Amino acid sequence: MNKTNEKKKSSLILKILKALLITLIVIALFVFGFYKLITHQWQDEPQTYDTTNQYIADLGDTMILAHRAGRRLFPQGTMMAFEGCINAETFKTDFFEFDVRVTKDDKLIILHDDTLDEVSNAVEYFGVTDVYPEDYTYDELYNLNMGEFFKDADGEMPYNGLRGDEIPDNLRVLTAEKALSYVEGCSEYYYSIEIKNSGYLGARAADILYDILSDMNLLDRVIVASFNKDVILYLEENYPDLYRSAYNMEAAGLFIDSIFNIDRPDGYYKFDVLQVPPDKYIANMGTSKLINYAHKNNVAVHYWTINDTDKMLFLQSIGADGIITDIPDVAYDTLKN
């Protein structure tokens, strides 16, 4: 009797193990198949659709977005950078891309990093590390040298060590309002502005930014971005007239939809622009399949951060609407000439 029970028990264990093995094989095949799908270089021909999105460019007319106003050419996000791009004789940019954060006194300054530690002499000036802009007033931050750690093409740091009156005005902390006023006084450009703050500060930044854009009649030439879902939801609820880009999960959703070519109704996607890296993560988003699908659904596609000329040309060839680059001069030579 005991032997019979042991045989039954062994048989049951064997069946369970076989079932588990089959399940694992099925899961592995599914994961492998899905991996192949999201990493595949789809070779669809670029298509033209009847769209209403002004940021969808004609094939071959890929727009150039100066990342942080051309961060490899000039100290990022400074007036010097905006001046340099606008006054350059050898290249032009279509967009200025920059990030904004709120100060203690509700000024919207141009800054990518969480703190000013690595782009200025803030640690030395304030005597502390982790100098967050929201802890200081604009007037306090205006004393900083925002070109402190900038390296030029030769690896030199031409503005390092400037202090006090030695710091030119175009190397000091810059507000979004001043930057936009200067640029618009020169010519009309497009802008991609990312709100870096989250939570209450993110909402406050959105309010301030909207007021600036509205007062300057720039609502139709600005794409507002954020990686923070709470900020996106706040924008959607309070400022539906703004053009905006997708946040992470929205971008992932469109990407998956594009692989399976899911037929979505008009207006399904609540964003106007997809701004993604082509191949930074596991997923291969730099494909004509994704661009065609986005265009079909009235969504423009910008890729970041593209500093390789071969990649620039490839993305242009598959229908990219814009590339975000640290070197707008090289991008202009590559894409426009």
Q: What label would you give each PLM region?
A:
Residues 2-337:
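Phosphate-group recognition and catalysis centered on beta-loop-alpha active-site segments
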